[in-house]
Design a protein with these regions (language model features):
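Beta-propeller folds
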Residues: 1-231
Length: 231
């Protein structure tokens, strides 16, 4: 990753190099993202497509000052949608349909949901309908002061399954997922907020009815106000 001068277009600094970074065994990267303070970089490797927009990947965190690379998580399982907190001190990410927070100052990992299960419960990641129709994959958001994390929970337990054959090996295999056809049941959605300091979760009152959508959930500039678009 090379820093360029905007006016001259000349390279002025190498910010990250797989050949010189400490603890780095990578040969190439897929993508990267700076934290808001530009002290750390999220490094993405081995991106694997899932649906139209979504993908799984392996994340690393690069400390620019220390020239040091380390995995985002030491625990098994592919990671999705990692996002720095506004203060740059934490990273929220999804794994196995659950949400986690990595506290970078202490190098600790906190699991904030535990009910995630494939083809049943999804926390913070769009189900197939939301990704396809609204074009979004990440459904969790940090509050501006980095003290709260809001997310959408998708309960797709009552959705009928659909299967198709995948021909990527000598013997094809069937892929089965929840696919609501027109007129059929969609996911039951709810919005939740996790308090980082108190380690408590609250469900937001979003009105009545189950046949609804929450295409956008976003914090306002007020740390106590969460904007929810309901359809």
């Amino acid at each position: 990753i090379i820093k360029y001068d905007y006016l001259s277009g000349k390279a002025i600094e190498t910010i990250f190099d797989v050949a010189t970074a400490k603890n780095c065994t990578l040969k190439k990267i897929s993508d990267y993202e700076f934290d808001p303070q530009e002290k750390r970089i999220l490094i993405l490797t081995d991106k694997t497509p899932i649906y139209r927009h979504s993908f799984s990947t392996t994340y690393y965190v690069y400390n620019i000052t220390r020239n040091e690379l380390e995995p985002l998580s030491q625990n098994p399982g592919v990671q999705n949608l990692a996002q720095f907190s506004p203060n740059g001190r934490m990273i929220a990410f999804a794994r196995g349909n659950n949400l986690f927070i990595k506290k970078l100052d202490f190098n600790t990992e906190l699991q904030i949901t535990k009910d995630g299960e494939f083809n049943k419960i999804i926390n913070g990641t769009a189900d197939w309908v939301y990704e396809e129709e609204f074009g979004r994959t990440r459904y969790f958001e940090w509050s501006p002061d980095s003290k709260l994390l809001a997310w959408v929970r998708f309960d797709e337990s009552e959705i009928k399954q659909f299967s198709f054959d995948v021909y990527d090996h000598p013997y094809d295999n069937a892929y089965t997922y929840k696919y609501p056809k027109a007129g059929e049941t969609n996911s039951t959605v709810s919005v939740h907020v996790y308090d980082i300091e108190n380690r408590t979760t609250k469900q937001m009152n979003c009105g009545t009815g189950n046949d609804i959508y929450f295409p956008i959930v976003q914090w306002t500039n007020d740390n106590e106000s969460l904007a929810i678009v309901r359809l």
